[in-house]
């Protein structure tokens, strides 16, 4: 919400560009996604402009040369003291061992919480289906969790066990039900058009059968997605796992096998790998050009996310349900030893507000990251930006004593 002069406050979007002429140069003027923009923020004005514009260059509080020097200094990398969380000071009083133990306990709570969700879902649909739904959701990344989960719920319709479809048919069904099959050929990418035509040859015969559960494309959020995380690629991967039908068996074999600790993450990735896919190994999407080098449908980063959020919690609660204490302890050991995953905006902000941006030796594992996320969920998520009535600072002080 912004207020311009004495005008009434307005609520809407803010677009940032280098210069105001970029509004037309980038096609914003004809893009309906930009119809709610109420302010155009630019570095320099130039020429005419059609909406309220804020030019930044004239309002710098220091010369640009001084700001360039400051940007490379230690001061620029430190988080402003007034923005630190109230827990930052007591957290700094903890030793490295105490901090690691605090994050470890938070990570265990997160593991148990995710495991409980699998347990509750398994009571309704069984362990196998709960795993499939979790894997679909895990590949939805942060923007497309719900549509991916919905596809997981439709597994028995898309891939009936009594009559398993072929890999191509599965890819066509998943992409078709998801609403992600382009209606027209590109007429520019021969390999993409050939594969798309094969998908449609399969899908057009079945689309009426799935009409009641086919999703609109508008459900999917593509903003800011890396090519490797595109839902079309994720569904191509899921089709391979469904076609083989041995996902739970593979994971259970990995869980009970004797593996050197240093190779646990790499062997899980190997267990999840699929045969070569002639199209998807060389394309990011159904519209993309041929890639120069082959790209796996599943990489180490996404495998780590699946491990700590889906696979290990599912295996852990299975061990608990089966009263297999030794297996439960082994799964916990793997969970706490798992290498750290990809950084994200929530973790970055949490490190800045809770630790002042200082390097923390206790954040070198995926479990430590999970522990920090649990702290954010349990405390920061129930307070405000100034930490009103947050109980975490007092808990940390009590921990230190």
Range-by-range predicted roles:
Residues 103-371:
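Hydrophobic, aromatic-lined core segments that form the binding pocket/scaffold
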Residues 2-13:
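Active-site beta-strand-loop-beta-strand hairpin of nuclease catalytic cores
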Residues 11-19, 40-42:
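Active-site ExK catalytic segment of metal-dependent nucleases
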Residues 355-401:
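Acidic, carboxylate-rich catalytic segments that either coordinate divalent cations
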Residues 21-29:
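Active-site-adjacent loop/helix micro-motif of nuclease/hydrolase catalytic cores
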Residues 33, 37-98:
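Compact, glycine/acidic-enriched structural inserts
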Residues 20-22, 45-47, 60-62, 141, ...:
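Short loop/turn segments at secondary-structure transitions that flank enzyme active sites
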């Amino acid at each position: 919400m912004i207020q311009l002069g004495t005008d009434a406050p307005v609520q809407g979007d803010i677009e940032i560009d280098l210069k105001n002429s970029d509004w037309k140069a980038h096609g914003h003027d004809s893009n309906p996604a930009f119809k709610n923009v109420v302010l155009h923020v630019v570095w320099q004005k130039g020429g005419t402009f059609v909406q309220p514009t804020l030019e930044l260059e004239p309002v710098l509080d220091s010369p640009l040369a001084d700001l360039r020097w400051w940007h490379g200094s230690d001061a620029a990398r430190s988080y402003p003291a007034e923005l630190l969380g109230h827990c930052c000071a007591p957290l700094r009083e903890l030793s490295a061992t105490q901090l690691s133990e605090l994050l470890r306990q938070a990570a265990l709570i997160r593991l148990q919480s995710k495991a409980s969700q699998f347990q509750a879902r398994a009571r309704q649909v069984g362990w196998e289906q709960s795993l499939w739904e979790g894997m679909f959701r895990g590949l939805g990344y942060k923007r497309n969790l719900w549509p991916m989960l919905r596809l997981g719920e439709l597994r028995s319709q898309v891939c009936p066990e009594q009559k398993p479809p072929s890999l191509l048919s599965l890819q066509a069904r998943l992409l078709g039900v998801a609403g992600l099959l382009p209606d027209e050929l590109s007429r520019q990418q021969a390999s993409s058009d050939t594969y798309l035509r094969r998908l449609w040859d399969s899908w057009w015969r079945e689309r009426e059968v799935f009409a009641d559960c086919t999703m609109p494309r508008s459900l999917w959020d593509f903003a800011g997605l890396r090519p490797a995380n595109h839902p079309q690629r994720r569904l191509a991967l899921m089709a391979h796992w469904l076609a083989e039908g041995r996902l739970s068996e593979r994971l259970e074999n990995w869980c009970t096998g004797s593996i050197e600790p240093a190779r646990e993450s790499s062997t899980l990735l190997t267990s999840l790998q699929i045969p070569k896919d002639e199209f998807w190994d060389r394309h990011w999407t159904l519209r993309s050009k041929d890639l120069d080098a082959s790209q796996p449908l599943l990489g180490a980063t996404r495998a780590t996310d699946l491990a700590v959020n889906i696979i290990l919690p599912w295996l852990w609660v299975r061990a608990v349900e089966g009263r297999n204490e030794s297996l439960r302890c082994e799964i916990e050991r793997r969970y706490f030893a798992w290498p750290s995953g990809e950084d994200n905006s929530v973790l970055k902000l949490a490190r800045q507000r809770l630790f002042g941006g200082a390097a923390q030796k206790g954040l070198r594992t995926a479990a430590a990251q999970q522990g920090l996320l649990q702290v954010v969920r349990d405390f920061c998520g129930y307070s405000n930006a100034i930490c009103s009535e947050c109980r975490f600072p007092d808990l940390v002080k009590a921990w230190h004593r």
